[in-house]
Structure formats: C-alpha cells, structure tokens
C-alpha cells in the first residue's frame, strides 16, 4: 500500500513494533489501536488476523469507526470458523480465539457497528474470511434487521452441532495423545499452541511447544509447561 503512495501507520502491541517499523519503513505505534493516536482521520483501516484475538471488540470497532473519514473503508481478514464448527475440530477451540466469525455473522457484525455496504467472502480454500464495510457519508439512522433473526438461529444451530461433535472428538483426541505417551518414551510436539489440550490430556511433562514467532521463544504458554522453542 505504501508503494502505491499511501501514508501508512501501523499498530503493534508486541516487541516486534520497532522491527516492523525498520523493516518496512513505516511508522509503527507500539500500543493498542486508538483513534487518539492518529493526527487526523484516515481513509482505510486494514486488519489481518487480529479481530479474533481482541477481548473488547466493540471498543475496537468504535475506535475504528471514529478514526475513519466519512466514506472510509474498514477491511479485515479473519479465520473462517464454519469449517471447524462443522467437523467438530478440537484444535480450533484449543487455539483460544476469543471471537469466531462466519460469513453471516461477520457482515451482520459490521452492520451493527454502523458500517454500510458491508460484505464478506472467503479465500479460495475457504479458511479465511475477508469482510468490509464503509463509514456512511451521513448518519445511518435505520439499520435493517431483515433476516437477522434467521441468521442468528442458524448460528445457534452451528454451535449446537459443534458442541455435539466436539464432545466426541475431544475424548478421542485425549485418548490418542495419552496412548502415544504411554507407548513410547518420546515427547509430543505442538506447533502454535497446544497448552490447553496438553493439560486436558494430562501430558504436560511429555510435551514440547514450538512457534514461528521469535518473540515467543523462551517464554511459556502457561506456568508448568516447557518453554516455547524455535521450530
């Protein structure tokens, strides 16, 4: 985007802020996103792999709405939760995302936040959702509730099905992990997480943890676990 002539400001709460600033030659603010950090309103806010981790998502969206010029674009990329809901994925839950998105609820969420001309689509393999909306040029007084009840009921059906499949799959996965530990003297390696399932299976002492993020190396997901390693 910078190469196309845009003035870019980034936000990063981790220690990578300075590294990214130097690497990409842009201003990176080492703090949570707040409209007050910006000198003026912006034309576009882009978020990738972020919304699913934010505890107070409503406040983040309020800050984003406030920071945008009228007609400005909010664009985000988030994991698509639906495939994992449908297959009862244990790892999906243990990854500990706070917010879970589908095509239906992502668009509905943006409308609730006051954005207009909202849309969403998946990437070619269906594991990521791209969602977008625009800050209205005029105050949007009437947000359509059309079809939202039906969409909400569908979301509840997804969650009920996920709960049923998850209970079955979790028991099988715990048994499989415990069998691997009992049948050998080797440890089990987890990449990008694994803390929750290792506790549930009671195999903490037989687990190693890896992550591609250098900032995490030497730290621990939770007390009592081994340090996170360079894969």
List where the protein language model places each region.
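Hydrophobic, well-ordered beta-alpha structural blocks that scaffold small-molecule cofactor pockets
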Residues: 132-231
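Conserved catalytic loop of SAM-dependent methyltransferase domains
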Residues: 92, 120-139
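Conserved short-loop catalytic and cofactor-binding motifs
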Residues: 48, 94, 161, 165
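A glycine-rich phosphate-binding loop feature that marks nucleotide/adenosyl-phosphate handling sites
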Residues: 80, 123-127, 190-196
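Generic recognition of flexible, low-complexity loop/linker segments
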Residues: 34, 118-120, 176-180
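Aromatic-acidic/polar surface patches that form glycan- and anion
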Residues: 99, 122, 170
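Conserved SAM-binding loop
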Residues: 1-88, 100-118, 133, 194-199, ...
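Short glycine-enriched, charge-decorated loop/helix-capping segments at active-site entrances
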Residues: 90-96
């Amino acid at each position: 985007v910078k190469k196309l002539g845009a003035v870019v400001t980034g936000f990063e709460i981790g220690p990578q802020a300075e590294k990214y600033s130097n690497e990409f030659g842009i201003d990176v603010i080492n703090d949570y996103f707040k409209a007050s950090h910006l000198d003026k309103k912006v034309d576009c806010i882009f978020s990738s792999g972020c919304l699913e981790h934010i505890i107070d998502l409503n406040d983040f969206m309020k800050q984003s709405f406030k920071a945008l010029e009228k007609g400005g674009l909010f664009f985000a990329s988030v994991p698509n939760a639906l495939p994992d809901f449908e297959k009862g994925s244990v790892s999906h839950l243990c990854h500990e995302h706070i917010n879970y998105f589908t095509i239906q609820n992502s668009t509905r969420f943006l409308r609730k936040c006051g954005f207009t001309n909202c849309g969403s689509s998946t990437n070619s393999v269906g594991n990521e959702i791209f969602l977008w909306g625009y800050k209205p040029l005029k105050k949007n007084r009437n947000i359509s509730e059309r079809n939202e009840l039906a969409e909400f009921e569908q979301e509840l059906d997804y969650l009920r099905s996920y709960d049923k499949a998850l209970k079955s799959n979790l028991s099988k996965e715990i048994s499989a992990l415990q069998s691997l530990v009992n049948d050998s003297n080797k440890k089990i390696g987890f990449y990008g997480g694994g803390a929750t399932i290792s506790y549930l299976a009671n195999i903490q002492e037989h687990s190693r943890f890896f992550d591609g993020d250098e900032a995490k190396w030497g730290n621990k997901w939770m007390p009592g676990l081994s340090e996170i390693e360079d894969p």
